[in-house]
Amino acid sequence: MPSPPPTPETATASDRTATPAPGMPILAVDAMGGDSAPGMVIAGLDIAAERHPNARFEVFGDAVQIDELVRLSKRLRNRVSIRPTTEIIPNELKPTAALRLRDASLRRAIDAVANGEAAGVISAGNTGAMLALAKIVLKTMSGIDRPAMAAIGPSARGDVVMLDLGANVVCDARNLVEFAVMGELFARTVLGLPHPTIGLLNVGSEEMKGDETLRRAAEALRESPIGPQFRGFIEGHDIAGGTVDVVVTDGFTGNVALKTGEGALRLVGDLLRRVFSANIASRLAYLLARPGLTRLREWLDPRRYNGAVLLGLNGVVVKSHGGADAEGFAHAVDVAMDMIVNRFNDRIRDDLGRHADRERLASDAFRATPPASATSVTTG
């Protein structure tokens, strides 16, 4: 007598691989990346599943652990396909070594995007390995020289998009213009801004400031279709000040600015805790200020801004912070789903077509220039 078909309660990892309905957005998930994986990852998917009822998840990693966790979630039972893998990429592993781990959960998740099994991939694992694997496996989109890492952060005027954050240490003018095009669309797609403003990060706001690369990029942006949205050069304090919606820079400068901002936020938090716990009077003051401080903490909550995106590849690639909790990971899933549902990559191709043909992108305004250390730089 044949055994009855498995129910959601009795299904094993290999059973839960139903084909999704047409039009369902599918996200490939590296379940083994992150400080608290796979528990944090599955808990984050559980939160995200409620916000994205049509989404499905291809989850890669230790099938036994993942299956036990998925069984605990009614929302995930029929929306997760578990893909067993035998290898994990540790955080300390160099990208060159990670490339050799063909059955690693991160590699298999990226492969799923390349094979058309998923529209995007998310991981909280090794950043360097994810960058290297995504570039090699997915490759850059036609019309894009280099991908860029973008993220959202707080500013005095709301949220701000910043790129590149470390994918490209040295950039030429053409790269910066491409970053601006991608960042502008990212702000429209994820932040919902109809006409986001753009600024080039520099050592001063005057037109003669900076090196030749920045000046050429600024000239090209002024003449581009997004020229009316380009506000010229901005300085470091303009990032938090909200002078523009999209901050464009090279990966070295962007990464330093990002880490500096994160450190400044931690310092503010530490100082507030010290001030309001110093004595009885300060504790009473805290009680009076508590509603406002609660709103401030919510506004600056790093979980709201979790989810850096590698733009310019043939597929959506989202990197969650390795130390994120379930809510933070769910926010990173939100970013990925926004990009998938809004057909971000298709729109990038359309925008690049509007900007210039390949001959213009190869013109003098976009040609590579030496790094700032080898050229004349005017500072403030």
Swiss-Prot record:
Keyword Cytoplasm found: yes
Compartments it resides in: Cytoplasm
GO terms for biological process, alphabetical: fatty acid biosynthetic process; phospholipid biosynthetic process
Keyword Cytoplasm: yes
Root EC class: transferase
Location of the region described as Disordered in the Swiss-Prot/TrEMBL record: 1-23
Any GO molecular function: phosphate:acyl-[acyl carrier protein] acyltransferase activity
EC number per UniProt: 2.3.1.274
Catalytic activity: a fatty acyl-[ACP] + phosphate = an acyl phosphate + holo-[ACP]
UniProt-listed Pfam families: FA_synthesis
Pathway: Lipid metabolism; phospholipid metabolism
CC per GO annotation: cytoplasm
Annotated keywords: Cytoplasm, Lipid biosynthesis, Lipid metabolism, Phospholipid biosynthesis, Phospholipid metabolism, Transferase
Subunit structure: Homodimer. Probably interacts with PlsY.
Role of this protein: Catalyzes the reversible formation of acyl-phosphate (acyl-PO(4)) from acyl-[acyl-carrier-protein] (acyl-ACP). This enzyme utilizes acyl-ACP as fatty acyl donor, but not acyl-CoA.
HAMAP family from the UniProt entry: PlsX (MF_00019)
Family, per entry: Belongs to the PlsX family.
Protein name per Swiss-Prot or TrEMBL: Phosphate acyltransferase
